[in-house]
Amino acid sequence: MQPALDRAKAFFDKRSRVPGKAAEQLARLQADVEGRGVDRADVVIEAIYENAAAKRELYARVEPRLKAGAILATNTSSLMLEPLAERLAAPGRLVGLHFFNPVAQMPLVEVIESAVTEPQARAAALAFTRAIDKLPLPCRSAPGFLVNRVLMPYMTEAMLAAGEGVPLATIDAVAVKFGMPMGPIELADIVGLDVCLHVGRILSSAFGGPAPDAVAPLVEAGKLGKKSGQGLYEWRDGKAVKPAVEPATPAPDDLEDRLMLAMVNEAMAVLREGVVGDADLIDAGVIFGSGFAPFRGGPLRYARERGVEVVVARLEALAARHGERFRPDPGWSSFGGPGAP
């Protein structure tokens, strides 16, 4: 617990410009390893590892101590809420509050409701998110919610391209040229290859696309990415060591579309399924949650600007060349052009 408090102190010292303010903020943090404050809390956030059984076991110990009206929130990044809530005495109090790393810098929080979440719990979760100066994105319970659901095909496609012999640095360079803050290979290393593999397998099981199994040997060897110093790249002093992009071996001419349209097509699936309420929220969520090239307006705005018919035709061409994972989502048939709802 002390290392966490030390990090908080360093953060407050760096951000506070008012004398004494950092000490005041730090004093409001209470280390509570034994959970003695649970019975007084308005919001209790669970953030243990992604295992449904472990989460349910924790809830069984915590829920009896919650006061009336308190909400129980999970920081799950990919698990549906319904199985997590099934053994709760009051399943309607469970919500999802999915923060993104680094939490201090990422403004977005996915606020997830299940089929049984009570309106009061949903409203309280949204209000709490705003109160801590975050941007709440309402989502329906579904594997991966919005951001991870859209990101995973992008990162998996990058790994498939790498398996075909495309250099890692070339893959990242193509994404950065499009406008992404970093490439999918570097992003996977930062997220953690163990996390990518776990989430990717959950989404593959749910939706049938490929999983990023190519990284399994690295995970088994403890090469997890930035946090272990070695992953797809070697990491030194917090930075990826990338070989120079070789001009003599240019990227495949369809690589940009393979990466970006994988995201775009998945964003359409999220819209069609009603996981997020409208296209504008999806675009905002993907920009703030993943860093999708902001000047392009988000994946669905990008599709509108490029032309829905053009995007669908490119997806069909990619499906013919690379497989059914690129088959255009049925939602494109009712998706309008610029200015359409």
Q: How would you name each of these model-derived features?
A:
Residues 1-341:
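N-terminal glycine-rich phosphate-binding loop for ADP-containing cofactors
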